[in-house]
Swiss-Prot record:
It is a multi-pass membrane protein. Pathway: Cofactor biosynthesis; adenosylcobalamin biosynthesis. This is Probable cobalamin biosynthesis protein CobD. PANTHER family: COBALAMIN BIOSYNTHESIS PROTEIN CBIB. The keyword Ribosomal protein does not apply. The lineage of its organism: Archaea, Methanobacteriati, Thermoplasmatota, Thermoplasmata, Thermoplasmatales. Pfam families: CobD_Cbib (PF03186). GO terms for biological process: cobalamin biosynthetic process. Its main location: membrane. The keyword Membrane applies. Coiled coil: none annotated. Converts cobyric acid to cobinamide by the addition of aminopropanol on the F carboxylic group.
Length: 304
């Protein structure tokens, strides 16, 4: 498992995201779109949503784990296939690529372009956001992305192997597609949102340590705000942990209008703060491997 993990990390660093036609996030989205109409015909939308979520996970998993099974007869091929599939469950490099598009646009003074790039990674309406609000949304996305796009899948990889990481990633995809509180998805997507809350519960709290640790190493943290004070302002029981931790790390006022404000007296965020938050993100990501993931994999390899 350690070799598979190191290989997957190397693929991310060297090659970045795989092509869409082999990416499970893209494939699961296509599967969901293809079968969604059938399940929406049921009167009980909540139960339909449960069956739908299970169906998407199973149908998405079949070709990937069939590939793992078929490759298992040749060890080298099996390891390489496992590396590639594990890589598809998490991402480090792509976050930096998305964020760079936003910061480059802001540096050029092109607010419209920055809004457009931001809209690719957030759910909120970006059409009227100013530079500070764009910066806040980007930093919040970096903080949340550390959890659901990285810490969570590798957390489940440690304890449940490749299937755990893979399923965690598909659950996150389902939540991003259907975990809304609008009329269309409130009942239908409730199970997807619930599963996402469950799998991110521990990783979100782990993120507090790694964001704080990384900001201290980088000598960024100038104000320690009580994270617990702000997590209750979020609808999600998980989102507040990484976002409030990042606000504390950089002493920033992070705000989603009409929803929450974190660190009311903090500085208004700007482009430089987005770049600092990315440095925290990278250091937190790699320190998580060194401090948490690898030691646990070694312990489990020796004693289990």
């Amino acid at each position: 498992m350690i070799v598979v993990l190191i290989g997957a990390l190397s693929i991310d660093i060297i090659f970045g995201e795989p092509k869409e036609y082999i990416h499970p996030v893209v494939f699961s989205g296509r599967v969901a779109s293809a079968i969604e109409g059938y399940f929406r015909k049921f009167d009980n939308r909540f139960r339909a949503g449960i069956l739908f979520s299970i169906a998407v996970i199973v149908l998405t998993a079949i070709p990937y784990f069939l590939a793992v099974y078929l490759s298992s007869f040749i060890l080298v091929v099996y390891v390489v296939v496992s590396m590639v599939i594990l890589k598809t469950t998490f991402s480090i490099t792509s976050m930096g690529e998305h964020i760079k598009l936003i910061t480059d646009s802001l540096k050029k003074g092109n607010i419209m372009e920055a809004r457009m790039h931001l809209s690719m990674i957030v759910r909120r309406d970006t059409s009227r956001l100013n530079e500070n609000e764009i910066s806040s949304a980007a930093i919040e996305s970096i903080a949340e992305g550390l959890v659901d796009g990285y810490i969570t899948p590798l957390f489940f990889f440690v304890f449940f192997g490749l299937p755990g990481a893979f399923i965690a990633r598909i659950i996150n995809t389902l939540d991003s597609m259907y975990g809304y509180k609008d009329r269309k998805n409130f009942e239908f997507g409730r199970f997807s949102a619930f599963m996402d809350t469950v799998i991110n519960y521990i990783p979100a709290r782990i993120s507090w340590f790694f964001i704080t640790f990384s900001s201290d190493i980088l000598n960024y943290r100038s104000k320690a705000i009580p994270v617990r004070r702000y997590i209750r302002r979020f609808d999600s029981v998980n989102a507040g942990w990484p976002i409030a931790s990042m606000a504390s790390a950089l002493n920033l006022r992070l705000e989603k209008k009409g929803h929450y404000i974190v660190n009311d007296d903090g500085y208004q965020p700007g482009v430089a703060d987005i770049e600092k938050s990315m440095k925290i993100y990278y250091l937190a990501a790699y320190s998580y491997i060194v401090i948490f993931v690898l030691p646990l994999l070694v312990i489990m390899a020796v004693f289990l």
